[in-house]
From Swiss-Prot:
PROSITE patterns: RIBOSOMAL_L36E. This is Large ribosomal subunit protein eL36. It comes from Tetrahymena thermophila (strain SB210). Keywords: Ribonucleoprotein, Ribosomal protein. One of its GO terms (biological process) is translation.
């Protein structure tokens, strides 16, 4: 916080901060967020192409339902996708797909 001093930790020109409602978000803050158009395109592609073979294997293990199979599903996903975090996200996505299939 500038106090108008020439040197030191509080050096610099004194300014007043804008209120929160007047501040604009920069484009970089939106980076990585999923837009409506991209989400729709991905959904259509998923409907047309279905699941990859490794995803089908994971779905079968999820349907089995035991803790052992759940761990094996995570291991398969991690092997294919590279990291544990990506594997967890993919497994959650496929679990949601299985739940949607059961509802129909």
């Amino acid at each position: 916080m500038a106090k108008g001093q020439a040197v030191g930790i509080n050096k610099g020109f004194i300014t007043t901060q804008l209120e929160k409602k007047l501040q604009k978000h920069s484009a970089v803050q939106r980076k990585g967020k999923l837009g409506k158009r991209v989400a729709l395109v991905r959904q259509v592609i998923r409907e047309v192409t279905g699941f990859a073979p490794y995803e089908k294997r994971i779905i079968e293990l999820i349907k089995a339902g035991s803790a052992k199979d759940s761990k094996k599903a995570t291991k398969i996903a991690r092997k294919r996708l590279g990291t544990h975090r990506r594997a967890k996200v993919k497994k959650a996505l496929l679990e949601e797909a299985v739940r949607a299939q059961r509802k129909k």
